[in-house]
């Protein structure tokens, strides 16, 4: 019988600290630079990793502090996708949320400059020896089966199979890139 390598203590997403929310708002209003925003984010990630390790976790995440959504930021930054404003907002526990979504706008591919790579490299740099830093990304099913995100595939692909092949390759190449950066735990949500 094989032994399970990890015990799963958390998904990886944490509530965003108030300091991060405020820094994001200042960035959106042009009051601070992206570099200043990342400085705040990095300090909070460092504190979170310390807290995770202090509480006995052997696998740590960056809390997804670099994201505004748990899934959309990743997709917006793949080649061949764009953000847009949909008519209706998401519904979550009866509350309305933002109306931002994602849709196809070209051939799909890995983005070698994806900001999640930078975030992982920072996470890895503040993760103590013997602790595993993990990456979380949304599964490709969020493109295929949700919110009409794949409806425009025929504008860019000759067939559904060609679209799926490129989507699979984009994920493969992205995960390989994370691996090349030292990631040994990539979680698809």
Predicted regions and their residues:
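Domain-level signal for soluble alpha/beta catalytic cores
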Residues: 1-189
């Amino acid at each position: 019988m094989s032994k399970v390598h990890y015990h799963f203590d958390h998904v990886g997403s944490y509530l965003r600290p108030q300091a991060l929310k405020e820094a994001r708002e200042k960035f959106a209003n042009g009051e601070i630079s992206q570099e200043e925003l990342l400085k705040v984010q990095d300090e909070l990630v460092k504190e979170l990793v310390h807290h995770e390790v202090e509480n006995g976790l052997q696998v740590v995440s960056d809390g997804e502090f670099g994201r505004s959504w748990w899934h959309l930021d990743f997709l917006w930054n793949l080649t061949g996708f764009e953000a847009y404003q949909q008519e209706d907002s998401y519904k979550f526990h009866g509350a309305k949320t933002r109306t931002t979504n994602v849709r196809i706008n070209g051939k799909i591919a890995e983005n070698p400059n994806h900001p999640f790579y930078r975030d992982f490299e920072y996470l890895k740099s503040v993760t103590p020896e013997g602790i595993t830093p993990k990456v979380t990304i949304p599964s490709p099913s969020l493109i295929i089966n949700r919110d009409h995100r794949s409806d425009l595939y025929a504008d860019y692909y000759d067939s559904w199979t060609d679209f799926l092949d490129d989507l699979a390759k984009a994920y493969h190449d992205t995960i390989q890139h994370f691996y090349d950066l030292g990631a040994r735990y990539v979680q698809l949500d």
